[in-house]
Amino acid sequence: MASMSGYAQTSAPVSLNTVDIGGKVPVTLLPTETAPSQALLEATSAKSVVGDIFVRNFVSPVADYTQVLNATPGAFSYSPNGVGLGDTKVTIRGLADGNSVISFDGIPFNDTNGVSHHSWTFFPAQFIGGATVDRSPGAASAIGQATYGGSFDLRSRELSDEKRTDLTASIGSWNTNLVSVEHHTGKFGENGENNLMFNIHQMKSDGYQTYNVQDRVGFSAKYEREISKDTKLTAFTSYMDLKNNTPNIKGIGRSDYNQGIYNNLLSADPTKANYYGYNFYDVPTDFSYVGIQTMLGDGWRMEDKVYRYSYYNKQNYNGTTITSTSATDKLNSYTTVGNILRFSKDSDLGTLRTGLWYDRADSYRYQIKSDPRTWVDVAAPNFRERYVTTTLQPYVEHEFKVNDRLKITPGIKYASYTQDFVHDQDNGGAVGPLGGTFSSATNTIAGGAANIANSVKYTDWLPSISANYMLQPNWSTYAQYAYGDQIPSTTVFDVLNAKASPVPKPTLAKVAQIGTVWKSDKMTLGADIYYMTLDGAYTKSATADANGNFAWIYSGKQINQGIEAEGNFALGNGFSLYASGTLGTYKYESGQSVAGAPKDTETLALNYMQGPWKTNLSVKRIGKMYNDGTPLTGSNSVYEAFQLGAVTVTNLFVNYTIKHPDAMTKETKVQLGVNNLFNEHKIVGIANATAGSTSANPNNADLLTVLPGRSVNLTMTSSF
């Protein structure tokens, strides 16, 4: 887990980028070149920036994007198979993954059956040049399907002005290795108007957990062309293919943990149900966009991005026995296309911003019982569905420059989501046989409708208002009040005969926050206080009404509130100290705690950057939290069933660069990286094996998520 924001950055006015609300943030290091990242003086919300220096030097070369996001206050995630070796989810402000927007160069990407994200198949460290983390719904111009939990914008790599080729080789714990080739053309063309960079890499690892093997191949390319002094074209494309043996059930047994066995997951014995050959993924993904930024004249700017990304998760996994139906043949796939069009206009009053986000996702999913020895599927699926999600979000906002010190930005966004479903008849796992008869003996369906179609539309008006006031040239304060929303999961119609009425409403959140930012060449400080009311989940009624309809019942509100602060201090002689902390409460109206939400987090990091050395020793502590359980009777969760103690993770990165080690080499950098330096094995998640299991009454079969052991990576990069 990374635990320090990476290096101080401040916005600089760049005319072609000012319209790009979610895209590239121009950055400049402070004169000391040692201070960690900081909030921006012009910010209107709680925002942290992580820079390329952090990603290149203080993140494992096999890491995914969650290690970059973890660098910011309050953010955390765990990968029980090791850093970069699993599908890791980030939590921030007590909200788990699926409650926030993650974007790449301003383009939101997410799963289509819920707003979740897959870190192991999109945007590894090789593709990332930093991130901007906004822990708020943002302004009206902030787009996405779950803005209330924040917007985390990953940035692509900056292109080099000079020609360069980088060769990287890395070896590490658990037979982990990575090789990478990266080439920068530098500026080329008659007037140096073109620039291109590409990266190709392969990562292999046995993983910390037994037989949880990972094999990842990735490619990315970025091209920029200055068409004129007022117009710039940017194109990006990436492809990844992940193959592994990760099972559907990823935890270890409590009985193993009690014996000091922290990584027993899969077996090499084909007579056992957890044989690794019965559990495997093949997940190819791609992500591409073409964007143009141009000055239209009379103060108008325009940016347009056309994008496409796809995800094809073919997973096969076994259950707890070996039979002709104990395994599952699973597919989760989607292709998303969209367009983000933005305009802005400067005037004496300030800046007008308006635009439209259009997004269409075509999805196909199924799960079918299968024989793990032959992978022959039964006839009737657990479910099989196709659906199209169409999103439209037009917005308008105006940043009023009241005077040289005060800016006020009101805005409004209209969010429209339409989903069109076609469910095939199934064995009762979702919509049932649709009037037919299902035979459990033969796993077939006789008669009934082949499929059923449904459609649902969700809409919301999402206003926002924010203000920034400069108390002094180096001291600002801000306030914001904003709405955010999230559409329900696609399981809305996963009831008998797909008859659901009424359907759930979108989750609506209202967020208020105030904050302040102070900075100098030697010190930066940022702090904020926030309060959020969030609509709680909906639960399906246990029985249908007289018309056969199942209702979705509102379960009440959730209230999140807290304070956050971060600061960095240049100590001199290349040393700097970074600290951050969060303190909050995350509770339902009933007063019970939200699962997975720590009461507090703290980070302390000591950095040394001088001459050929770049080092970072960071400690991050995640406070105690709760996990829910399953009751002996009924279907609702048991809140606060399991209490998890505080977790502290220490990481160390040491980089040493040798300039011109030989006539052909520009420089060679050697990096030693250690994650979980003190080899902690704390429990970070619990899933009860039997109903009624709690911290007070644990079951030895409970499944535990445990910190992976210490991992060490030695990496060498040579530039030619």
Regions found by a protein language model. Name each.
Residues 404, 530-543, 551-632, 715-719:
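Gram-negative outer-membrane beta-barrel transporters
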